């Protein structure tokens, strides 16, 4: 745990008592603050009280007594409307911050030279974050991994010289971190997502940009320039005097890092030098993973990791669950079917990465639809032998696929998985792929994408003749 001493002797309100909120309560109390905890969920209030915290309805308390409101990232700060706690805090002149802000203040106060790597982007954050941590551990670094990827940042070990924190950050977390100042900041990409919480894509992109704009003096901003928002951000941040590493998998850069399916290259003016090979690494298959690997490579090279250790670490990286996870193979008379769990693909842009990585696809898609549908995936339709549509999006997706891709409305994973497996086995293809890449949120049928992917894995492993990869 990281004790938060910056509010010692003061009263702090914490709203939202899930994993990061409860961790904030513990860290603030350990640092000497008085914590008043609140949540709309009564069970979480009870849990906090049992853990020894004062719980109260913050509506009934004088807000001028609070030094800060620590807000969980899931609570609206601005859109579609500020949460009532935010309005109360603003009326009383109380700052509204999140758990990563508490970390940044502790690091600045106690270990300002301790390396801190922060990663954001619409897609690829978790894989890139996990890969950076893996590479640094391979290099022998004392590495703490957390943030949006799982472990609450304040539950990690405290910053100190020689210890690096590798932290995935969502746009919600960045919004609550005004002092964000990583040693290395990474902005992978920006595509339309979370507009319900940010109002416009321009505001969403501006929030993402703050992570790389805030890199501390002498640090490195690594920015994907394959979208217009990244290109503009790189130019602005470079003009502000920061060290910018431009990253691309679509075209050349003058200074920066590029990648394709085979290798990662460092570019310095007219000179391009290979720093690592990617060919044959199954956990980093696809051009989207080449981008993730390029970002991770740029980060660890900036911290002093050698190309030799980088290559070893890339080859030993196991990948992440629910992100193009190869969960099994089924050997048939005519071919071998590969089953791939890409449940994390909760929008069309993410699903495009998986569809581009395979041929002869038996595609399981659908769930709670997002704006834009799947028309943007039309260039990949020739790769799809048949689609199996589930959830609320089934009828909408069927209308898009009509006359272009054979489909059936399966409604559930329980129906889709055996149907896709049967059709793949009977297709006569040498290497058919049953791919769960939903292009939708999971909330119509599952609490989160992890449970959706876990259910897919269970259904696949229950099929006759399926062996683990």
Curated annotation (Swiss-Prot):
This is UDP-N-acetylmuramoylalanine--D-glutamate ligase. It holds the Pfam family Mur_ligase_C. Gene3D superfamilies: Mur ligase, C-terminal domain (3.90.190.20), Mur-like, catalytic domain (3.40.1190.10), NAD(P)-binding Rossmann-like Domain (3.40.50.720). ATP binds at residues 121-127. It catalyses: UDP-N-acetyl-alpha-D-muramoyl-L-alanine + D-glutamate + ATP = UDP-N-acetyl-alpha-D-muramoyl-L-alanyl-D-glutamate + ADP + phosphate + H(+). The gene is murD. The keyword Cell division applies. It is an enzyme of class 6 (ligase). One of its GO terms (cellular component) is cytoplasm. Belongs to the MurCDEF family. Its main location: cytoplasm. InterPro entries: Folylpolyglutamate_synth_CS, Mur-like_cat_sf, Mur_ligase_C, Mur_ligase_C_dom_sf, Mur_ligase_cen, MurD. It comes from Rhodopseudomonas palustris (strain ATCC BAA-98 / CGA009). It is found in: Cytoplasm. Its EC number is 6.3.2.9. GO terms for biological process: cell division; cell wall organization; peptidoglycan biosynthetic process; regulation of cell shape. Pathway: Cell wall biogenesis; peptidoglycan biosynthesis. GO terms for molecular function: ATP binding; tetrahydrofolylpolyglutamate synthase activity; UDP-N-acetylmuramoylalanine-D-glutamate ligase activity. HAMAP family: MurD (MF_00639).
